[in-house]
Amino acid sequence: MYHPKALIIALLFTLSLILAAKSAEQLQIGVKYVPEECPVKSRKGDRLSMHYTGTLAKDGSKFDSSLDRNRPFEFTLGAGQVIKGWDQGLLDMCISEKRKLTIPSHLAYGERGHPPVIPPQSTLVFEVELLGIKNRHVDEL
């Protein structure tokens, strides 16, 4: 004989597993700091200057950091110059804003990884700070 409470508990447990799996597949954007004034936000086509530190989600080991080189990283947002998780996760950022991006493997380096530093199927975590937007005219900033 089935007990309604046991059935409900089993359904809730199954639902929680499904939701946990879904969240692991999606880009997670955590806003760590936003300046009080934000006259301009990043958009596709912008040339961004960033500081970042990248770690593996599974063990927290650092694989890269612009801070270690004391040299910001520059790229064009939305141009495919970086992993998809960055192109998506850095949209609508303010200058000086800091974010934590948790990027599932399919939006990072996928099944191949980036040997020898990033294993296949790795979820990546990036602490990022937008230092500047290089290509905007003064009146747009």
Swiss-Prot record:
One of its GO terms (molecular function) is peptidyl-prolyl cis-trans isomerase activity. Residues 1-23 form the signal peptide. It is an enzyme of class 5 (isomerase). One of its GO terms (cellular component) is endoplasmic reticulum. It comes from the Eukaryota. The keyword Transport does not apply. Residues 45-134 form the PPIase FKBP-type domain. Disulfide bonds: none annotated. InterPro entries: FKBP2/11 (IPR044609), PPIase_dom_sf (IPR046357), PPIase_FKBP_dom (IPR001179). It is found in: Endoplasmic reticulum. One of its GO terms (biological process) is chaperone-mediated protein folding. It catalyses: [protein]-peptidylproline (omega=180) = [protein]-peptidylproline (omega=0). The keyword Signal applies. Inhibited by both FK506 and rapamycin. PPIases accelerate the folding of proteins. It catalyzes the cis-trans isomerization of proline imidic peptide bonds in oligopeptides. Belongs to the FKBP-type PPIase family. FKBP2 subfamily. This is FK506-binding protein 2. It comes from Cryptococcus neoformans var. neoformans serotype D (strain B-3501A). The gene is FPR2.
